[in-house]
Amino acid sequence: MTEIIKDLYQFTEVMEPIKLSMHQYLLMTNEPVLIQTGAVSQAQTTIPKLQELLGERKIKYILISHFESDECGGLALVLKEHPEAVAVCSETTARQLMGFGITNNVLIKKPNEIFAGDDFEFQTISYPCEMHMWEGLLFFEKKRGIFFSSDLMFGMGENHGQVIESSWDAAVKSSGADTLPNQESGQKLSSDLSEIEPKFVASGHGFCITIVG
């Protein structure tokens, strides 16, 4: 694990043999927030590290972009250690979590809503990434300027703890939003991203990005 910027810890599992880094994050606030759980194998490795950081504290919220193994495959394991944690996700993702019997303790958010707590304030952004291109979510933490990119701004390789620099305009243009199967949805996503002003991109796969210029 690495404190990749102040208050934000990155955990990484590398999928072999393709060398795909899968990152999860803990935002260390008074109400700790876990962003993605990783698959079961990663959660098994991450949970002791979380305990090391948290001490007596418990995870308050778990942010889930969409229903996929690297996003929430380890959720049941995390909830065994943090049973009061609330999964924050889209309505579509919530139906999957409840339908598969993983958890009913969910907070459903719609796009362009604010989800705030003790020392954090997240804005939600529509992300058409669920099955049938239904709606998932991206999360932007406004107080610190951290954008959690999930499967956007995708990169291969072993890149735990590694940060590059880019302008936000260049990051959006190379994010992959315009390659979504539904062209209209991709254009809307690019437009939505252009309206936020992050300082840092916490990547789901690939290098993190410090925004410059």
Language model features: what each stretch is:
Residues 2-51, 137-150:
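Conserved beta-strand hairpin/beta-sheet module of binuclear metal-dependent hydrolase folds
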Residues 16-18, 40-42, 68-70, 128-132:
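Short beta->alpha connector loops
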Residues 35-37, 59-67, 87-91, 147-151, ...:
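Active-site neighborhood of phospho(di)ester-bond hydrolases with catalytic His/Asp-centered motifs
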Residues 39-40, 69, 154, 208:
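Short, glycine/acidic-enriched loop or turn micro-motifs at the edges of active sites
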Residues 42-88:
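Active-site metal-binding motif and surrounding structural segment of the metallo-beta-lactamase
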Residues 60-62, 119-122, 170-177:
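Short, basic, glycine/proline-bearing loop/turn elements
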Residues 88-212:
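Metallo-beta-lactamase
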